[in-house]
């Protein structure tokens, strides 16, 4: 989530080599994640009680989907490193050591049309965990990026399977740049990390525990006005000039509000357009580029 890219060019390969050997891997050397430590003080009732920790995976979401197809529920897949992590629109998602890369298997009893409630709740929950543990105030860039100021610190990727009009399962990937040196990434990736923002290494164990607890609480409150209100209040997109790329084409305008169903309300001249999905780019400043 820290950054997206396409096919690896030679320059990209050099950057990934730097990511593998750069200063951000200090956290893994000094404090690798330990399953027993995470579980020992985990405050959840059901989420993450089946926790599977890997030194390296291609993609936590890929494994979680295969387990969800076998009936798993509440399981959390956690990896120190992802080699083929992905973000929205199948973009590459850099997942070096020092971050938190995990996927959750959820089985909400809701229609597929209400799946947006899950994304909304998870975004709010991760923001709450970061805020409560570290005193930072993350914003949410529509639809699922987490920002500190203008820089990306995390993100959510939800993949769902429906049975008729009902949701069979949702696999939700959560990526957080915890102890990663953002200077390892190109400036145009606009990344930051929690350790950079607080000025010291953060406890990934404590953050995982708090994040899972907040997710469980928010998930059990799906569809509530409380979740929507906080999601809207934390928006880093309302009031911004944006460019939206969707299947129907490209839209540019000012974001007037976010609807309760997760739609972005975009003002274009005298027209208010509802956007349910798409790639959102914040344009610089209120007036655009």
Which residues fall in each region the model found?
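Long, positively charged amphipathic alpha-helical accessory segments at protein N-termini or as interdomain linkers
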Residues: 3-5, 14-29, 46-47, 112, ...
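Short conserved micro-motifs on helix faces and helix-strand junctions that flank
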Residues: 82-84, 142, 172
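N-terminal lobe of the biotin/lipoate ligase/transferase fold
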Residues: 2-5, 12-132, 154, 202
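Conserved active-site carboxylates
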Residues: 145
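A short coil-to-beta-strand element that immediately follows conserved catalytic motifs
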Residues: 75, 137-141
């Amino acid at each position: 989530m820290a950054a997206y890219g396409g096919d690896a060019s030679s320059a990209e390969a050099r950057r990934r080599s730097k990511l593998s050997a750069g200063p951000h891997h200090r956290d893994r050397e000094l404090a690798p994640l330990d399953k027993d430590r995470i579980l020992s003080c985990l405050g959840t009732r059901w989420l993450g009680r089946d926790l599977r920790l890997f030194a390296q995976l291609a993609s936590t979401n890929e494994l979680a989907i295969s387990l969800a197809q076998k009936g798993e529920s509440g399981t959390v897949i956690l990896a120190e490193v992802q080699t083929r992590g992905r973000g929205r629109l199948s973009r590459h998602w850099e997942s070096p050591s020092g971050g938190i890369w995990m996927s959750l298997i959820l089985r909400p009893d809701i229609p597929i049309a209400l799946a947006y409630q899950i994304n909304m709740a998870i975004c709010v929950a991760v923001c709450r965990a970061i805020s409560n543990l570290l005193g930072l105030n993350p914003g949410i860039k529509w639809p699922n990026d987490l920002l500190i100021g203008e820089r990306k610190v995390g993100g959510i990727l939800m993949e769902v399977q429906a049975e008729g009009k009902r949701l069979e399962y949702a696999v939700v990937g959560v990526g957080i740049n915890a102890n990663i040196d953002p200077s390892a990434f190109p400036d145009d990736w606009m990344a930051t990390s929690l350790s950079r923002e607080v000025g010291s290494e953060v406890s990934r164990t404590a953050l995982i525990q708090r994040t899972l607890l907040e997710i469980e609480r928010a998930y059990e409150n799906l569809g509530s006005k409380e979740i929507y209100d906080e999601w809207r209040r934390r928006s880093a997109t309302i009031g911004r000039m944006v460019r939206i790329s969707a299947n129907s084409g490209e839209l540019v305008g000012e974001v007037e509000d976010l609807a309760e169903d997760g739609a972005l309300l975009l003002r274009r001249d005298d027209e208010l357009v509802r956007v349910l999905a798409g790639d959102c780019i914040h344009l610089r400043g209120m007036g655009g580029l």
